[in-house]
């Protein structure tokens, strides 16, 4: 053994760890701030839509066409969304366009405003991944910045939902299915908790649900049910992912034009949703609600 060689190795490792920690802190603050803006605007839009749903819902098809136009006009590559993140994490892509951040935020805001359904977790992860990957490329981190990318994904998820523990493990396992990127644990944890604290400090509301019942993990029956439900939920998630991929491929083959594709789906959807609004008036839980026209 060479003591001087070992010492140099320790110094190199300490320097590397320090850089990852510092990067995680900076990214956590930046991504948490973006999450706060995105989340607060989304909450405002949701309240506004709820108060004017009858007026806004018929314009859902036009909103969809507008979103397609935005991507095609400004950066069509960004329309791949999470696929870009996965490819970057697996080393199959050199960069993620920064245009993805404003486009995915605007697309989600528009979708929610006109009554469409768009998840927030994907947006949060894409925001964090895009910013962190650009940061990693700018400062030439090793392994195509994979650790920094994972930290950014954790920051995006943790900043929007303020669930830092869940964000860390989600980011560590989502890039490569079936494996955990343990080397990214420390940077991901720091970035996630920093982003969560930042978005909270900037006034982003955290959703909380109080549970009146507790589960006993010493009860064999309860544990058996939990295992069965876990298997069922996993299979359901797998089925959904496969069907989603197949439907996208099918629609892409049948209707290659994205404008026709969005119209084919959104126009009937808007009609059915609009006609279904009358059910709100006769449903027991909401019969006293007033809908603004």
Regions found by a protein language model. Give the residues of each.
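Alpha-helical transmembrane segments and immediately membrane-proximal extracytoplasmic
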Residues: 1-283, 287-289
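Hydrophobic alpha-helical segments, chiefly the membrane-spanning helices
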Residues: 292-293
């Amino acid at each position: 053994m060479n003591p001087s060689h070992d010492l140099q190795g320790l110094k190199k490792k300490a320097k590397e760890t320090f850089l990852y920690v510092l990067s995680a802190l900076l990214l956590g603050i930046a991504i948490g701030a973006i999450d706060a803006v995105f989340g607060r605007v989304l909450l405002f839009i949701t309240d506004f839509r709820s108060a004017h749903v009858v007026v806004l819902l018929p314009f859902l098809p036009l909103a969809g066409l507008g979103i397609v136009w935005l991507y095609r006009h400004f950066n069509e590559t960004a329309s791949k969304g999470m696929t870009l993140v996965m490819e970057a994490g697996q080393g199959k892509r050199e960069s993620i366009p920064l245009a993805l951040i404003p486009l995915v935020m605007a697309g989600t805001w528009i979708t929610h405003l006109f009554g469409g359904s768009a998840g927030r977790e994907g947006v949060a992860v894409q925001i964090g991944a895009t910013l962190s990957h650009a940061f990693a490329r700018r400062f030439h981190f090793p392994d195509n910045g994979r650790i920094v990318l994972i930290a950014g994904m954790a920051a995006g998820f943790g900043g929007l939902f303020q669930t830092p523990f869940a964000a860390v493990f989600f980011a560590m396992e989502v890039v490569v299915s079936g494996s955990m990127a343990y080397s990214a644990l420390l940077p991901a944890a720091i970035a996630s908790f920093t982003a969560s604290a930042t978005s909270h400090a900037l006034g982003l509301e955290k959703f909380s649900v109080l549970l009146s019942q507790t589960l006993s993990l010493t009860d064999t029956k309860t544990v058996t049910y939990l295992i069965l439900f876990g298997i069922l939920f996993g299979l359901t998630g797998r089925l959904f992912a496969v069907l989603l991929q197949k439907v996208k491929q099918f629609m892409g083959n049948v209707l290659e034009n994205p404008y026709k594709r969005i119209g084919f789906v959104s126009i009937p959807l808007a009609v059915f949703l609009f006609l279904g609004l009358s059910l709100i008036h006769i449903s027991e839980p909401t019969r006293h609600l007033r809908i603004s026209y």
